Amino acid sequence: NDASSSKIRDLKKAAGLNVSSVSNKSLHDYGMTEERISKIENVLWSGGEPFMSSIHWELMEKLVEMGRTDVKVIYNTNFTFPEESFERAIKLLTNFKNVKILASLDGTGEDVEYLRKGMNYSDFCKNLEIFKEKLPHVKIAINFTATSMGIFTLDGVIQLCLDHNLEFEGRNAILPDRSEMSINAITPEALNDALNRSTAVASGTVLEPVIDKFVKFLRSKYMSVIFDRDLLKKNDLVFGQEEYFEKRMKGLFNV
């Protein structure tokens, strides 16, 4: 999740790759016979945008035709696909009993619109509500990737989850070598402030355990890179000690 699907498409085009040829393959091209399809138990649709993929519609509608609506389905989507695909998706997913949607959202408002090309935060929230209303059996979770910009609106993302009764899944962080987008591009004090605001919003709610776990993950990821790239190189005999690591953690993040 180091780049949005639209940016990846732009890079492919710049490199002279035929993007359309990838998305227009059929089930036959992948050797997906009815016998193989009948044995499917789980389906994971990931980015680009699955609801704009012809192979997605072909397989999912084939599963409905074959009566295999018991298949477990997981989507990773940014909820900003065209209206005709949106209506088609609602009609399709009405058939499936076990569906979970991981809605990619790396911030709120103008921040996330800057982060993800073509993202419209207002449309995202509107489409989210329509899905919840039309498909009450579908589980929806916000899939958050920590970035140097988005981390400052993590508290807003958490509030969105609470307001709309959504799950939260924050398992990702931009890799440190992508310096301008990594949380390691900001100061410990700024990161600490953003994370403290986020835990405060989640405190006493159903999201408190998962947010606490995610915050600890981000802090440990931030610290591990500091040590690996800077301090540890200077004196691995000192900075590699667990006792010192704990001390630095407490000093930077008051934990």
Positions of predicted regions on the chain:
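Core AdoMet radical
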Residues: N1-S26, I37-S54, M66-S85, L93-C125, ...
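Pre-Walker A adenine-sensing motif
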Residues: G31
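A general structural signal for short secondary-structure junctions and capping/turn motifs
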Residues: E34-E35, E133
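Distinct, well-ordered alpha-helical segments
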Residues: W57-E61, E84-L92, T153-D155
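Alpha-helical repeat scaffolds in large eukaryotic proteins
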Residues: E61-V64, E129
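Conserved C-terminal portion of the radical SAM core fold
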Residues: I74, T94-L105, Y121-N254
